[in-house]
């Protein structure tokens, strides 16, 4: 049962997230030979100010 977690900065529309989840599901199903019903995609909208690579705050854009 594949679980796919995607962290993105906030700002994508619901339609974009739906398309992303569908396309990720297609690829995982094809490559991992897993039934689509067994694939779970989690999309986490990260507010600005919550990501600090190398100790520095990453801003959108």
UniProtKB/Swiss-Prot annotation:
Q: Which GO terms describe its molecular function?
A: isomerase activity
Catalytic residues as annotated in Swiss-Prot or TrEMBL: 2 (proton acceptor)
Task: Give the residue range of the signal peptide.
Answer: none
> Top enzyme class of this protein?
isomerase
EC number(s) per UniProt?
5.3.2.-
| Record keywords, A-Z | Isomerase
Q: Does the keyword Isomerase apply?
A: yes
Name the InterPro entries on file: 4-OT-like_dom, Tautomerase/MIF_sf
Q: Does the keyword Ion transport apply?
A: no
Name of one Pfam family that matches: Tautomerase
Family of the protein in this entry: Belongs to the 4-oxalocrotonate tautomerase family.
* Protein's recorded name: Probable tautomerase SMU_1087
- What is the organism of origin for this protein? Streptococcus mutans serotype c (strain ATCC 700610 / UA159)
